Amino acid sequence: MNNVKKESGLTMLPGQLEPVKVGRRLFLRYAGAAVAGGAVLSSCKDEENPTTVPSTVDLGTGDIGILNYAYALEQLEAAFYDQVIKTPYTGMTDAEKTLLTDIRDHEIIHREFFRAAIPAANRIADLSPNFTAINFSDRASVLGTAKAFEDLGVAAYNGAGPLIKDATYLTLAGKIVSVEARHAAAIRDLLNPKSADFAGDDIVAPTTGLDPATKPADVLPTAQKYVATPLSGASLPTA
């Protein structure tokens, strides 16, 4: 099958979500030390104690900016679940590990899709996560964070959808958000098994039956708490 070259410069395989082959049990280590945009080593009088200042990453404009925005969120989620599997919380069952491994692999697929699809000249670099607020040895801390990430991801894709101009990208975003919603429901079921929480009123509006849609300007401040690299969505479309 031949690759399709979009006018915007994005290359992808027709009808496929993942232009790269990623196995279900693929285990990729996250290069957390990489800082998007490069790290600036500030000049200081005490050369033995230099200060590393991460450069602010501008996500860009138009559809490319929205794809970079999604790429940033997928980097965050993939890094989080990778750490969860590398350092399982106390009492993690085999069933929980299997589920969380599957979610990790899905997030890696999403991350690698955006990495391959966005032209290198426009693509943001690897982001450095900041998970200091998460206790990875504690089940409640890990699953509570997973719930927050998945709910945020669903709302972010829903909010970004109307900002995407290219129909192909919009379709792909719709496919990804459907998977993210499945993740959100699965995590909620782990926290409160066999309850209505998998699609609770706190996340699905009773009057519309829809998940929330949150604009990038409202999503980024929450995501930034878990990303050491400063992000700027100032140039992203708003309508």
Model-derived segments and their meaning:
Residues 2-21, 31-33, 46-239:
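All-alpha RGS (Regulator of G-protein Signaling) helical domain and cognate RGS-like helical scaffolds
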Residues 26-44:
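N-terminal export signals
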